[in-house]
Amino acid sequence: MEIKIAEKNNLSARLIVEDVDTTFMNSLRRIILAEVPSMAIDEVVVIENSSMLHDEILAHRLGLIPLKTDLDSYNLPEDCTCKSELGCNLCRVSLTLDVEAGDSIRTVYSSELVSENPNIVPVSDKIPIAKLAQAQKIKLEAYARLGKGEKHAKWQPVSVAAYKNFPKVKINEKLCDACGKCVEICPKRVLTLSESGKKLELRNIIDCTVCKDCVGVCPTSPPALEVSWNKDVFVLDIESTGALPVERIVLEALKILNKKAELFLEQLSVKKDEEAKVD
């Protein structure tokens, strides 16, 4: 397997994954969504709330605020040595919110959550939590823990995880007369004419949706274009919520997938040994 970075910015990446099949890509995608842990508020103790929001709605909103995650410093609650429902400083982070509207209406933002760990904070300071009327107040303490998306979507480290087969477009230059009809109909502008206008060229083939509209409008018979996809090369699009860098998400997913494969082989070996003893 080989992974190449086609595009990347602070929150998203487009990767080209080679020498794998659909089964592998589907497993990787599901693990990214459901099993790579991230930090999220899991419990809220409301001390005072005179806003229009019910306590449970307020807690729900807090739970959906993405938090920056430190996988190296914290344990999953079920793996922590404290074995406590309350948690400890190795599996839980406390955040407080103490705001009051005063004489005017105001909006409470995620920037006003105060964390005991400066590394575990909301990914954005501009996420609105509630709107307070005059003299209304919210005072609470929230507890964030590591969790997995398979339990609740608030623990998913990504907002997008999708893949497709890498497109494959072949141009038969002997048949193509550069009429330009395929260029006009291509929704992703993958096809273009050369500067001289006498030759059909490809650009950004990774954007091709394999719609085959270009093949349908080609006036030659047979068409001068062949559009298909590579069976063992894929394009993986990932958009992080900001909880973890994209690279860390992919690496953690690959580690988890590798552990699952090792466990399966181990169990398979044990099963074969048991059957051999019976025989």
Segments from the language model and where they lie:
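Protein-protein interaction/assembly regions in multi-subunit complexes
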Residues: 1-279
